[in-house]
């Protein structure tokens, strides 16, 4: 497996010179990544500082009592190259046995913690609605399958909307395919119930192309976060079945170019896609981060310039109300 991933990343590196003139050089925002206890503030800050991402929206994993302390440390060490997303899952929100009241109190406590520490947070991290079981040495997880009408989900969404922030939802339409039609219908109803708010689907919700067209046609405010919808994730899924999610989608062809149908959909509906890398584990920061950034910059260059700028920067700026200039070319 490591050998295959190594070949994947080497192929990306070797292609840098060949595509030097067709790499997107505009402002690049990673609209959702995470830092956990397996990587230090100093280490992740060094990685952020030396790579070509202009701004990272960051949520903290691990101990909830030190979440804001960790974020402030990283923000200082990166010289303000990060913005804070209040974590939603640190106190058992995505655990079946955790009561909804305690899970919601966890989010409220983390918001109070951020305010007390004078952190100008720009939003909240992903709300886990559905998540497949995880069988890995670093995480044993029984999975969870809520829907958008579940008590804790409704209350979490309400907290975010009352703060006038975009709602990031983690649903897995393929891993829970038996419920996909229900979830799609609930998403449409949610978008229409709150027409002036924005909802972002993490990892593009494992959505199939026809389902994405359906969401775009039926709503104006349900958008897609691009994280983990690529060849690297597809290879891991193929070689290590059964350890975690198996429903990942892939926007790319074998040469790391956008598949034409997705390319066309992005060009036609650029305000519906938000770029994010979603580094979760320490390995996401240590292994292949630079190559993933390059892969996305190369892919963005294949879009028309307005679409590329919106997906890479403009949409995140608008939805999260970020104070950043979205340049099409930083030269």
State each model region's role.
Residues 2, 20-29, 35, 39-55, ...:
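Mid-to-C-terminal alpha-helical segments outside catalytic/metal-binding sites
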Residues 6-15:
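Bacterial N-terminal signal peptides
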Residues 27-31, 54-60, 83-88, 122-126, ...:
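Structural recognition of the beta-strand scaffold that forms the well-ordered cores
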Residues 32-41, 60-69, 93-105, 147, ...:
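Acidic-and-aromatic substrate-binding clefts and catalytic sites of carbohydrate-active enzymes
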Residues 139-274, 323, 327:
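Catalytic pocket-lining loop regions of alpha/beta-barrel enzymes
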């Amino acid at each position: 497996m490591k050998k295959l991933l190594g070949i994947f990343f080497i192929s990306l590196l070797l292609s840098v010179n060949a595509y030097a003139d067709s790499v997107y050089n505009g402002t690049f925002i990673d609209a959702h990544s995470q830092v956990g206890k397996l990587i230090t503030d100093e280490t992740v800050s060094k990685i952020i500082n030396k790579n070509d991402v202009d701004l990272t929206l960051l949520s903290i994993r691990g101990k909830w009592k030190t979440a804001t302390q960790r974020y402030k440390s990283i923000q200082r060490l990166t010289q303000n190259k990060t913005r804070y997303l209040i974590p939603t899952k640190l106190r058992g929100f995505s655990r079946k046995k955790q009561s909804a009241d305690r899970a919601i109190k966890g989010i409220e406590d983390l918001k109070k913690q951020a305010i007390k520490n004078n952190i100008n947070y720009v939003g909240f991290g992903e709300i886990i609605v559905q998540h497949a079981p995880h069988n890995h040495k670093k995480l044993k997880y029984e999975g969870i399958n809520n829907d958008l009408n579940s008590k804790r989900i409704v209350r979490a969404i309400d907290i975010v909307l009352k703060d006038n922030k975009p709602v990031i939802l983690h649903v897995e339409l393929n891993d829970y395919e038996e419920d996909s039609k229900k979830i799609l219908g609930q998403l449409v109803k949610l978008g229409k119930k709150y027409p002036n708010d924005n909802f972002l689907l993490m990892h593009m919700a494992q959505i199939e192309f026809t389902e994405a067209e359906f969401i775009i046609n039926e709503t104006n405010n349900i958008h897609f976060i691009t994280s983990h919808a690529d060849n690297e994730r597809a290879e891991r899924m193929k070689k290590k079945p059964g350890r975690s999610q198996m429903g990942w989608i892939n926007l790319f062809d074998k040469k790391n170019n956008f598949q034409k149908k997705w390319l066309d959909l992005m060009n036609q509906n650029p305000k519906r896609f938000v770029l994010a890398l979603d580094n979760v584990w320490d390995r996401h920061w240590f292994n292949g981060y630079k190559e993933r950034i390059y892969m996305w910059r190369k892919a963005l260059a294949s879009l028309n310039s307005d679409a590329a700028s919106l997906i890479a920067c403009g949409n995140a700026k608008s939805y999260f109300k970020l104070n950043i200039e979205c340049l099409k070319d930083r030269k």
